[in-house]
Amino acid sequence: MYGKMKEFLTKELAGIKEAGLYKNERIITTPQKADIKVNAGEEVLNFCANNYLGLSNNQRLIQAAKDAMDSHGFGMSSVRFICGTQDLHKQLEAAISDYFKTEDTILYAACFDANGGLFEPLLTDEDAIISDALNHASIIDGVRLCKAKRYRYANADMADLERCLQEAQAQRHRIIATDGVFSMDG
């Protein structure tokens, strides 16, 4: 069984390579920043990282992470709601809430997780979510995971958005989901 599958996958991979669609992994050998070295020391500009604020190599944050590892160890060892919430999480969430003058804050390990988990607890099948067609995959996944009736409008097309709003008029709540920076179409 495995022999046939391996043979099939080998042919598929060869076809992908022949079509010029094979993606070689770039190995970054420097800290994440705007200019990085990859593979055998090739210097390139990094336009694809999620390091939007340049915080991944901020020395104060690196030192804070080292201090946290010294006092709390490495990693949460579980998801937050089982036994992964530590006092450091609650302290940071309180500081963020205080800074933004909000009632509470919930930290997620990644924005993908935050977007994926946003809509489901807020919306029911009585509601509507109206999503821009070029939203990030994480927003699209979050929309798919919720029970709300789903509508999609053409990217930044206000007339199409208005059409969706009219179609969803009978729903209890109508929420528009749009990206801050549309990154999914290059």
Residues of each region from the PLM?
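N-terminal glycine-rich, Lys/His-bearing helix-loop that initiates the first secondary-structure elements
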Residues: 1-98, 167
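General beta-strand structural signal in soluble alpha/beta enzymes
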Residues: 46, 104-109, 131-132, 152, ...
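Active-site phosphate-binding strand-loop segment of PLP-dependent enzymes
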Residues: 51, 151, 155-186
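Short loop-beta-helix segment that forms the pyridoxal 5′-phosphate
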Residues: 79-83, 94-117
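Short acidic loop-to-helix transition motifs that present clustered carboxylates
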Residues: 112-114, 136, 156-160
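Conserved PLP-anchoring active-site segment centered on the Schiff-base-forming lysine
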Residues: 118-137
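Short, structured coil segments at secondary-structure junctions
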Residues: 125, 145-147
